Amino acid sequence: MPCGCGTSCKCGSGKCCCGSTCNCTTCPSKQSCSCNDGACGSACQCKTSCCCGADCKCSPCPMK
């Protein structure tokens, strides 16, 4: 079951978190992902799949 989008959602540990303590710039997915370099930050984005590049942003980092 996918979570909703908005400021109340975030991705982490491969799961979706919706609540006052959650925050995500994009709609997250329950699927886990990781960047090839294993680094997190602006290079990682969690959607239906993992995308790594300058056009990706996500906070916090998706599951390593």
From Swiss-Prot:
Keyword Protease part of the UniProt annotation: no
One term of GO molecular function: metal ion binding
Function: The metallothioneins are involved in the cellular sequestration of toxic metal ions and regulation of essential trace elements. This isoform binds exclusively copper.
Record family assignment: Belongs to the metallothionein superfamily. Type 2 family.
Stated name of the protein: Copper-specific metallothionein-2
Positions contributing to Cu(+) 2 binding: 5, 9, 24, 27
Free-text comment on this protein's domains from its UniProt entry: 14 cysteine residues are arranged in C-X-C groups. These are thought to be the metal-binding sites in other metallothioneins.
Binding site for Cu(+) 1: 3, 5, 18, 22
List of residues binding Cu(+) 3: 11, 16, 18, 27
Residues the record lists as binding Cu(+) 4: 44, 50, 58
Residues that, per the record, bind Cu(+) 5: 33, 40, 44
Keywords: Copper, Metal-binding, Metal-thiolate cluster
Species: Callinectes sapidus (Blue crab)
Keyword Protease appears in the UniProt entry: no
Binding site for Cu(+) 6: 40, 52, 56, 58
